[in-house]
Amino acid sequence: MNIHEYQAKELLKSYGVAVLDGHVAWTGEEAAEAARKLPGPVYVVKSQIHAGGRGAGHFKDDPEGKGGVRLAKSPEEVAAAAEAMLGNTLVTKQTGPAGRVVRRVYVEAGCDIKRELYLSLLVDRAKSEIVIMASTEGGMEIEEVAEKHPEKILRVAVDPASGISGFHARRLGFGLGLDATQMKAFAKFVNAMYKAFVALDCAIVEINPLVVTGAGEVVALDAKVSFDDNALYRHPDLEKLRDEAEEDPKELEAAKHSLNYVALDGSIGCMVNGAGLAMATMDIIKLYGAEPANFLDVGGGATKERVTAAFKIILSDPNVEGILVNIFGGIMRCDVIAEGVVAAAREVSLSVPLVVRLEGTNVQLGKDILSKSGLPIIAADNLADAAQKIVAAVKEAA
């Protein structure tokens, strides 16, 4: 689960992470009032969407204009900047061409920036460690730094069993070229950030940029926090921070039915049981010249109702031109899948090609249900056959 910058900063501040003063606003008038509460004379107005690259982005109705992060020198300028953003669609590298509608802005005090750095914490699942990453290339996308200047990314690993120690921050600080005063502030910042990361069950905490001020202070100029969805049951208070308007409606609907769904950019909808088989299915679709429209794992204990819901979610994507159902029935019974597919196809008046490959428990019963349904369902014998048939059917229907 992702949250907005202002929410992330409020949480991190409660654990001792240094952030600038700021207030959220939903209107231009509220933004001006927020500015009056700050020291000035410089203010920063930031669009609040679940995506990075806001400053370098552009608004759909003004592609040549200013981005989603703007400087202002008076409450009146703050109000004008906020009104120019609110209700408009901001397009960044991370939003894709569709962009995101700005529904709130964050008004923050200006800052005397001497240096811009990068700092993040994430989980290394392969090694069961928490990795702290830092770089002198603050303000840039870390993926771009990793590609062009991998030597500029510093890493230290922390064993969760023993926790963070002073040498972790010192090693990074020396690598970043911090002086003694800055090192002390940096160590305090890293320790507070680690404490928040562990206590809140985060998947990632990213500060980009982390700035060193003229006075030697270390402050989070931006903040991104993402939580481990599997741990949210331990944090009911964090659920209140969810902004469903920033999430894919299809993914929200899938979550209600305990389905693992991720929207992609292709045209072939996929419904599979098991994450590994789902990824293999997406790979073979690409092998035969098409692109998957989604990742969808119905799980091992799916019911007819869940399968029907999964089918509807796939078809709610206007980019879907065909559907491939690939089921290996171990715990999952093929007849249950078949009943769900038939029920959903009838309910939504299926208008795109559908290929179904079934194997495993009750496979013959499942095939009988499909063949007797009277629906134009294309049967496949194996994964390669299924991928070839759905790609061919989509091309023929085009």
From Swiss-Prot:
Matches recorded under InterPro entries: ATP-grasp, ATP-grasp_succ-CoA_synth-type, ATP_grasp_subdomain_1, Succ-CoA_synthase_bsu_CS, SUCC_ACL_C, Succ_CoA_ligase-like_bsu, Succinyl-CoA_synth-like
Membrane-spanning parts: none
SUPFAM superfamilies the record matches: Glutathione synthetase ATP-binding domain-like, Succinyl-CoA synthetase domains
Pfam families the record matches: ATP-grasp_2, Ligase_CoA
Cleavable signal peptide: none
Enzyme kind, highest EC tier: ligase
Subunit and partners: Heterotetramer of two alpha and two beta subunits.
Protein name: Succinate--CoA ligase [ADP-forming] subunit beta
Natural source organism: Acidiphilium cryptum (strain JF-5)
UniProt lineage: Bacteria, Pseudomonadati, Pseudomonadota, Alphaproteobacteria, Acetobacterales
Gene: sucC
